[in-house]
Amino acid sequence: MGPLRQFVQNFRLLSGFGTDHRVFLDVVKACASVSDLTSGRALHGCVFKLGHIACSEVSKSVLNMYAKCRRMDDCQKMFRQMDSLDPVVWNIVLTGLSVSCGRETMRFFKAMHFADEPKPSSVTFAIVLPLCVRLGDSYNGKSMHSYIIKAGLEKDTLVGNALVSMYAKFGFIFPDAYTAFDGIADKDVVSWNAIIAGFSENNMMADAFRSFCLMLKEPTEPNYATIANVLPVCASMDKNIACRSGRQIHSYVVQRSWLQTHVFVCNSLVSFYLRVGRIEEAASLFTRMGSKDLVSWNVVIAGYASNCEWFKAFQLFHNLVHKGDVSPDSVTIISILPVCAQLTDLASGKEIHSYILRHSYLLEDTSVGNALISFYARFGDTSAAYWAFSLMSTKDIISWNAILDAFADSPKQFQFLNLLHHLLNEAITLDSVTILSLLKFCINVQGIGKVKEVHGYSVKAGLLHDEEEPKLGNALLDAYAKCGNVEYAHKIFLGLSERRTLVSYNSLLSGYVNSGSHDDAQMLFTEMSTTDLTTWSLMVRIYAESCCPNEAIGVFREIQARGMRPNTVTIMNLLPVCAQLASLHLVRQCHGYIIRGGLGDIRLKGTLLDVYAKCGSLKHAYSVFQSDARRDLVMFTAMVAGYAVHGRGKEALMIYSHMTESNIKPDHVFITTMLTACCHAGLIQDGLQIYDSIRTVHGMKPTMEQYACAVDLIARGGRLDDAYSFVTQMPVEPNANIWGTLLRACTTYNRMDLGHSVANHLLQAESDDTGNHVLISNMYAADAKWEGVMELRNLMKKKEMKKPAGCSWLEVDGQRNVFVSGDCSHPRRDSIFDLVNALYLQMKEPVVF
């Protein structure tokens, strides 16, 4: 800019000696090309003083300079002062207005239309028709088409091209765009490009490719834009056809050196190969490219990312930065940040953030800020996400959606509501993505009332009815189901009618399962014509929770028979079945599948550990525990629970010590499990120390289960009076579990005097529980109070209380044998009873030492 202004200043000094108007023409054009308004104004004054303004070419050049510098007030003022208004003059003003003054351009065009002379030319329509697209004004576009026909310009190449492009952008392909294309007398490469792009943009890929094939039969040769238009069309086809067609086009390009060396064409070819998954061919072509621009690098980085080649994408970005020929732009950053998230590389993401902060042009780009928010949200770093959000100078609805989504499932509920309040004050219209974040928040806080509010807003805003794919409807259904309102979820399901998808069915099915409505779930399953792994995994869970282990295993086998690969959720639903059957053989099969399938989810490891312990194999449980360095609180709790069930209190204390060294803070569930382990192992002092630490170390209030464990520990030392005092002095009302614990201790230590008092408290706390009555009956029996036993038995009979029958499992050679108390249905019952009787007689025989 500086040298040009110096030149203009020197030119003005020399102009007094007389200068040809053609020199003025060249200098004014130079000012227009770089939008140098200051120099242009100076030249305008000079031209005016010397009388060169009377020259038509010079005046048009000055007019064009004002239009290019977007000084439309000066441009129109000069226009009104001009004596000769030919089509070129009108078109200059129309071009300037079309950049930023859409409606004003249309008014100016109408003024030209009603003027006696001149009439709009083909260039005029080439300027105004694209403006109709930008304004979304198809009515005026069609009106102009009528005017074009009356003016006899419909066969003109420039006008025809503009009409084809306009109709294609409005989606009016048949008959409008195609008729306009067919009417062009001399079709040039732009004509063919317009119709191919029009078909492609309207997802009419077969027609687009057919048009390209017809073009090849014409004298007009495809150019770089044609190749760029047709390659995405090929990529959208069936993979085998796509590869064959794309390679044929590549061969066509190689035979024409002017296309082969064009960087735009090379970028399009690389993009095509990446879209069809031919990564090696894309990489080879990229390496051979003579010249690469930033688009070349961006195409390959984004292509690697879309093909899940995260490391290759990151390595290429690293090469781009260190090569230094071109600098990353916003497109590069938007592509690479999700790659860092996939690689769980927070450090590299932060380095990229630092790079952004050092380059203000990136910091000002809203899309870059949006990508940063999403990146930090993937790591659960809401503070960093909010910081990136607060630094953004301009925020759009995508920015707000990204930050709301970051906070939606975090514990920071107040911040989410505060952000939502600010969004509503910004007067930005919420879209369906915003609603999805709101529903995620509602699920997080289990707020059924809030789900109804969001539902009401969605209906009023018309967001539900505008959906072709019921993404929002499915999300509402899922939110109602997860918040426990299956009735409303079913209403949403019915409302979706023919728009129901597999997601709709699975969401309702999951709602039924979570609410325990297994019959409704099974009925819905029978109605489903399409199923996926999620569906079948839910069916495994239904049978597992319904105590139908054989059916659950049958469903699991059906999953494999259908060629589906069970995932983490499937196995987690199946493992409780192994515990129900107490089948170590089945657990080991599941463990083998987990290893072969590479299922390393920490929650799955915790469940596997727990089931091994429940099946009696502490060795396998501890092996699973030791195998994962990511041990979390759930795994520690499961390991302690396993030791607790088997009375291995010392080992449980060792795990507790290990957890403390790992700086993992225990929760109520873990402490209760530790207390249970101490109770079962008789570790009274250790247990009481852990109980005291609930308040003194961890700053928590004991739960009812923990109070019951403390009572058990005190009573196990024979200090029943102390235990009774502890219960009566509790800051909360003791429940039946606590009184029942104390009653069992009274029975064990033969303290019937205290036991009668405790029994009365127990019945007052829970009078209709079968187990409580059996417990009291056992106490009477231990004290030989048979009248009390009979009285309680009669009372239980009157209340129709039944003690559940005892049940045992025994696995022999992978075959499960079930024995229920009083059951004689086993096929080998005779030999079993004979052996039991023989063992009983041996036990009765006197032992001789």
From Swiss-Prot:
It holds the Pfam family PPR. Residues 814-844 are annotated as: Type E(+) motif. It comes from the Eukaryota. GO terms for molecular function: RNA binding. One of its GO terms (cellular component) is mitochondrion. PPR repeats lie at residues 20-54, 55-89, 121-155, 156-187, 188-222, 223-260, 262-296, 297-327, 329-363, 365-399, 400-430, 431-465, 469-499, 501-531, 532-566, 567-597, 601-631, 632-666, 667-702, 703-733. Keywords: Repeat. Belongs to the PPR family. PCMP-E subfamily. This is Putative pentatricopeptide repeat-containing protein At5g08490. It comes from Arabidopsis thaliana.
